[in-house]
C-alpha cells in the first residue's frame, strides 16, 4: 500500500480487525515515499503510522532504504516468523528515483519524458534508450521464480494427495469449495413465502440463512454489530474469533466499509460463500 492508502478510512477498519483477530499470516508492505499527487505528504498527513499499527496489535518493521532488496527480504522473513500478529513493513522509498524530479509530486502521475527516462536508466547503469529487458533477467526469473513455484506446488500436491487418502470426505469438500461446487435446494422453504406474505423481510432472510447454512458448510454470515437487528446470525454456530477460527458468524464490529471489502476478498479467493447485513 502507499501513503494515500494510509489516509483511507477502510485501511484503519481492516487493520484494526486484523490485529484484533491476530491474523499472523498477513504481511503488508507500505511504500512510504512521503509524496502525494498534489505535493508533499506533510500537507495532509502527520500521523505516526508505526505507533498507530502497534496500537492495533501489529508487528511493525522498517526498511530504511527501499532500494535495498536484501533488507526487504529479511523483513519479509521476519514477518513470516510472527504467528500471532499481522506485520506492517514500512519501506522508505524515493518516488521517481533516478529522475531529475525524484522525491517530488512531479513524478507521481506524469511520464518522465524521453530524456529524463534515459538519464534515470543511466543512473542505474542501464544504457538502453528504448524499453528493454535483458535476457539474463528472463533467465533469472525462470530459475528462481518459476522453479520455486513449481517446487512449492509439487510439495503442496504431495501433501494434499496424502490428505485425500487419509480424509477423503473432507478433501472432497475442500475441492468442491474451491471450485465453487455445492448443492442448494430451498424450493420447499420458499413455498412458505407466497406473494403477499406478511412478515418483515429480515425475518424471512433469517430463515433462508439457516437453511443455506445447513446445506452448505462453507457458508458464513456476518454483520457490523447489527446481528440482533438485521438477523444475520447462523443459529447454533460459534462466532469467528481468535479462540475459534472455525466459527461461522463473522463479527466485523462497527466497520461497514471493511466488512464489504473483506467479503469481496473472501469471495474472490474462493473456498467459502459469505453474506452480511447492515443498515443504510
List each language-model region with its residue ranges.
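Glycine-rich ThDP/TPP pyrophosphate-binding loop and its adjacent helix/strand module
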Residues: 1-144
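Thiamine diphosphate
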Residues: 143-146, 150-280
